[in-house]
Amino acid sequence: MADSSRGTYWITTFGCQMNKADSERMAGILESMGYCAGSGEDQADLVLYNTCTIRDNAEQKVYSYLGRQARRKRDNPALTLVVAGCVAQQEGESLLRRVPELDLVMGPQHANRLDTLLSQVEAGQQVVATDDHHILEDITTARRDSSLCAWVNVIYGCNERCTYCVVPSVRGQEQSRLPQAIRLEMEGLAASGYKEITLLGQNIDAYGRDLPGITPEGRRQNTLTDLLHHVHDVKGIERIRFATSHPRYFTERLIEACAELPKVCEHFHVPFQSGDDELLKAMARGYTTARYRRIVEQIRKLMPDAAISADAIVGFPGETDAQFRRTLELVDEIGFDLLNTAAYSPRPNTPAADWPDQVEEHVKVERLKELNALVERKAKACSQRYLGRVEEVLAEGINPKDNTQLMGRTRTNRLTFFPAGSHRVGDTVPVRIEQVRAFSLSGSAQAQPALVR
């Protein structure tokens, strides 16, 4: 447990899994400095917002939170106020003009330098750190939110230039960690009792493009496929997942490896964004709907029970009703287990934000509503296949609504509830599924020999 010689801290995280992983590392740094986790942001001595700028509503929420803490700091000058993440990177110095009470503004490439930057704050400086920074040698020990499941960053940044996306400008160019370093981190996690690892990257299929080495066959020596083989035999790790994938780089070789390696879970998150080829071209996504359908076909051919989740955008500039209907058709055809949906939000410094044919907000709202209704219907249909089956569930915690139940996830990432009985958090339990909902399952624990996959 961290000591409290410097007081308490509170971190609020907005956005993606990458941000959550960064927040865990920053929490680890703060505890190594002598801070301890507080009970709430309004009581903490240091408040840090790890921000997201992927959509405008997330960004505006940050400013609302900041306004409250700025008022608090005017009454309590000893409060340390930090903005990290993508809004910090995007806005930089202008954040200080908007919120002069801030002590530190730091982009995501500087998350592992939090201790160094705070030492400058303690010396009386108001600090902005948004310059490009090579981060791979700066990996720090994280304070994990879970004691069983951990994120492991394998590649930072993104070299894609999707016309709607601000990520490359705020997270920088791709930087891949060495396979040996990733394996070493996983071995340390296994020694600490972790059972499930999710390998993380903004565009994880691009892993290794910046690393040297060519095989005799002429392909890159370090790919995500090679990495999965390299880390698969880490003792103690029972499950391996990875996210987020890009259809342009999602290869048949990768799919075959996932089918062959028993620890790799049968769950794939592969965003498609639109079901219309003209819009995909305008988005600069680099693939067609036919290519996306082939990926799904290959996954289901080798892993018939695999779960497939994705992301989709409605209301992209120029989207016609006919083009939106093609997105609905794709969703209806594939039947995603989960689909993260969003109305297009113009982001600063992206080409699509300046295009003249912006879709009206009320049209976006109606399209999003229609898509979400279809998503729920298809998810309910997907859930039916689990009824009566026995699924392997890693018990991650106690059901907050019923403390007699444990909850965890199947290998296909379905949230599942079951009576605890003699089982405890951390057990891997065969559960017979007796009730299905759109996005969760319920059942009862079975004797170990009943486990089938």
UniProtKB/Swiss-Prot annotation:
GO cellular component terms listed in the entry, alphabetical order: cytoplasm
EC number(s) given by UniProt: 2.8.4.3
Cofactors that this protein relies on: [4Fe-4S] cluster
Name of the top EC class for this enzyme: transferase
Residues that coordinate or bind [4Fe-4S] cluster 1: 16, 52, 86
Domain annotation TRAM: ranges: 384-447
Cofactor annotation remark: Binds 2 [4Fe-4S] clusters. One cluster is coordinated with 3 cysteines and an exchangeable S-adenosyl-L-methionine.
Key word Iron present: yes
Family indicated by similarity: Belongs to the methylthiotransferase family. MiaB subfamily.
NCBIfam families documented for this protein: miaB-methiolase, MiaB/RimO family radical SAM methylthiotransferase
Subunit description: Monomer.
Predominant place of localization: cytoplasm
Stated name of the protein: tRNA-2-methylthio-N(6)-dimethylallyladenosine synthase
The entry's keywords: 4Fe-4S, Cytoplasm, Iron, Iron-sulfur, Metal-binding, S-adenosyl-L-methionine, Transferase, tRNA processing
Recorded superkingdom: Bacteria
Alphabetical list of PROSITE patterns matching this protein: MTTASE_N (PS51449), MTTASE_RADICAL (PS01278), RADICAL_SAM (PS51918), TRAM (PS50926)
Originating organism: Synechococcus sp. (strain RCC307)
Molecular function as annotated in GO: 4 iron, 4 sulfur cluster binding; metal ion binding; methylthiotransferase activity
GO terms, biological process: tRNA methylthiolation
Keyword hit for NAD: no
Entry binding sites for [4Fe-4S] cluster 2: 158, 162, 165
Pfam families, A to Z: Radical_SAM (PF04055), TRAM (PF01938), UPF0004 (PF00919)
